[in-house]
Amino acid sequence: MSEKELLVPLDTYLASGIHIGTQQKTKDMEKFIYRVRSDGLYVLDVRKTDERLRIAAKFLARYEPEDILAVSRRIYTMGPLEEFGKYTGIRTVAGRFVPGTLTNPAYKGFMEPEVVFISDPRVDRQALKEATEIGVPIVGLCDTEHLTSFIDLVIPTNNKGKKAVALIYYLLTREYLKNRGVITDDTKLPFTYEEFLEKAANPKYRIIIQPKDKRRRRRRRK
């Protein structure tokens, strides 16, 4: 794949840090790794990330937005995730994923999605567990240290950095809408990468105390 065929210029990908992994790797993610740096950080192959973004957008576009559920508990991902939902109509859960959301019909927030999108297999493990139990396809953002045995479609990426997650969700939003036929011209988008970046760079949350176990949990302000 030449640079001209990428979704954005290679320099844009590199500037976002989308390729910067961690100092751990798993067998599952080995095929997406380009090299290891002298400081021990594994570097992801940008072209494989680009390829998987295209595949994921086409796959998700086969579903109506209300049949997709996208979730994330990572602070810097919540804002871009909500922008993703705002422009695509896809349902999102930014923050704590309540146990039983997909498996307990008695729960008032019960949902029956046809596909689930997660931002981190480890952080979003409750959503991953429930999606696996009900047998729906799972798309996930995965870094070099993740296990992917329950992920049907892996998007290899730095899923922790502000710029990286902002770019990922910007591109997913753009490509999903293009594949759905909602937009045809990249120059006439109703949103910008900078808008997604602003949401990632300025997370709004508050700390509350859970009455049962007294644990501190971060929640987004309304």
From Swiss-Prot:
InterPro entries, per database record: Ribosomal_uS2, Ribosomal_uS2_arc, Ribosomal_uS2_CS, Ribosomal_uS2_euk/arc, Ribosomal_uS2_flav_dom_sf
HAMAP family registered for this protein in UniProt: Ribosomal_uS2_A (MF_00291_A)
Domain of life: Archaea
Gene Ontology MF annotations: structural constituent of ribosome
Family: Belongs to the universal ribosomal protein uS2 family.
Gene3D superfamilies linked to this entry: Glucose-6-phosphate isomerase like protein, domain 1
Coiled coil: none
Protein name, UniProt field: Small ribosomal subunit protein uS2
Keywords: Ribonucleoprotein, Ribosomal protein
Organism: Methanocaldococcus jannaschii (strain ATCC 43067 / DSM 2661 / JAL-1 / JCM 10045 / NBRC 100440)
GO biological process: ribosomal small subunit assembly; translation
Listed GO CC annotations: cytosolic small ribosomal subunit
